[in-house]
Amino acid sequence: MTLDLHDYVASIQDFPEKGVTFRDISPLMENGEAYRQATNAIIKFARDKGVEMIVGPEARGFIVGCPVAYEMGIGFAPARKKGKLPRETVKATYGLEYGKSELYLQKDAIKPGQKVLITDDLLATGGTIAATIELVEKLGGIVVGTAFFIELKDLNGREKIKDYDTLSLMEY
């Protein structure tokens, strides 16, 4: 039976601030069949692309990417905030509404020429994912696609990653 994954996303009005509708994937993760269906769709996308490594940005990219990597029998590399990774890293800086942020990836996480899929729970403005792509490419990896549970179409995040094949399971 195919579930409508939209039924497993809670829409919270005025969170984290007035005028924002927060899309909460907790109900999806709390339902084994919905989580499995979403994960399996990304696994199929990854297999079709010959993916050899998954990279996900902190923290919800881990929730999406780890089960995909596990099921495929491949590795997962976390892109993390400053001070969270113990070995030598590369850095990418990206803009936020009020300032800048940084993501890091350990230098030995990606092999040159390795086919990489980047996963996250949600594509909004595209800044975090563009920074994650930059990290992978600095290390010589080939980003063969990006995959998300949710895409917020009005924020035009896909424009920042338009050169990459992108899978979004749900759009709002």
Curated annotation (Swiss-Prot):
<comment type="function">
    <text>Catalyzes a salvage reaction resulting in the formation of AMP, that is energically less costly than de novo synthesis.</text>
</comment>
<dbReference type="GO" id="GO:0005737">
    <property type="term" value="C:cytoplasm"/>
</dbReference>
<comment type="similarity">
    <text>Belongs to the purine/pyrimidine phosphoribosyltransferase family.</text>
</comment>
<dbReference type="InterPro" id="IPR050054">
    <property type="entry name" value="UPRTase/APRTase"/>
</dbReference>
<dbReference type="InterPro" id="IPR005764">
    <property type="entry name" value="Ade_phspho_trans"/>
</dbReference>
<dbReference type="GO" id="GO:0016208">
    <property type="term" value="F:AMP binding"/>
</dbReference>
<dbReference type="GO" id="GO:0003999">
    <property type="term" value="F:adenine phosphoribosyltransferase activity"/>
</dbReference>
<dbReference type="GO" id="GO:0044209">
    <property type="term" value="P:AMP salvage"/>
</dbReference>
<comment type="subunit">
    <text>Homodimer.</text>
</comment>
<keyword id="KW-0328">Glycosyltransferase</keyword>
<dbReference type="GO" id="GO:0002055">
    <property type="term" value="F:adenine binding"/>
</dbReference>
<dbReference type="Pfam" id="PF00156">
    <property type="entry name" value="Pribosyltran"/>
</dbReference>
<comment type="pathway">
    <text>Purine metabolism; AMP biosynthesis via salvage pathway; AMP from adenine: step 1/1.</text>
</comment>
<dbReference type="GO" id="GO:0006166">
    <property type="term" value="P:purine ribonucleoside salvage"/>
</dbReference>
<dbReference type="InterPro" id="IPR000836">
    <property type="entry name" value="PRibTrfase_dom"/>
</dbReference>
<dbReference type="InterPro" id="IPR029057">
    <property type="entry name" value="PRTase-like"/>
</dbReference>
<keyword id="KW-0963">Cytoplasm</keyword>
<keyword id="KW-0808">Transferase</keyword>
<keyword id="KW-0660">Purine salvage</keyword>
<dbReference type="GO" id="GO:0006168">
    <property type="term" value="P:adenine salvage"/>
</dbReference>
<protein>
    <recommendedName>
        <fullName>Adenine phosphoribosyltransferase</fullName>
        <ecNumber>2.4.2.7</ecNumber>
    </recommendedName>
</protein>
